[in-house]
Amino acid sequence: FGVFFGLFPRGLQRTLKFKAGLDTPLSDCERIITNLKAGYPRLAEWQQVVKRQAEARKYSETWLGRRRYLPGITSNDWGEKSFAERCAMNTPIQGTAADILKLALARLIVGLPERPWLRPLLQIHDELVFEVPEDKIGEAVSFIKACMEAQPFPQFDVPIVAEASVGPTFGDMAEMG
């Protein structure tokens, strides 16, 4: 996904090395990025539009209007400017995902008084962890999925699919079918 946020071939090479243990030649990384951009022909155009808007405004926005200010976007230092540009491209995607999760959390909170047995424990990026009695797992999963899969706002026409895993500990989770 880094390519969507402006990852360069050398960055892809490093990511493949340290996260997947692959020694990928730089030329292969260049080809991967070129092919990805060919598969998504409007990607490069979108990236340029986002960078130009961010430079003009000095911030980038999520789809719901939450702003991320980018003081380095006009820097003469290439590293600082490049980082700000990647942040500008990241915000509409990852930031909007965070906004959607916050809306799902609000729906969950409203339903908690009727489900005193459902105990939210923590959030990890786009995951929510709950403590639930075994005899309430089915009911809990149905409720949580409904809250998380609800369309966050009218203009959002992308289906949201939430997956559920259960287990006695966080380390022993198994995906539910």
Task: Write out the residue ranges for each language-model feature.
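Conserved catalytic core of nucleotide polymerization and phosphodiester-bond processing enzymes
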Residues: 1-177
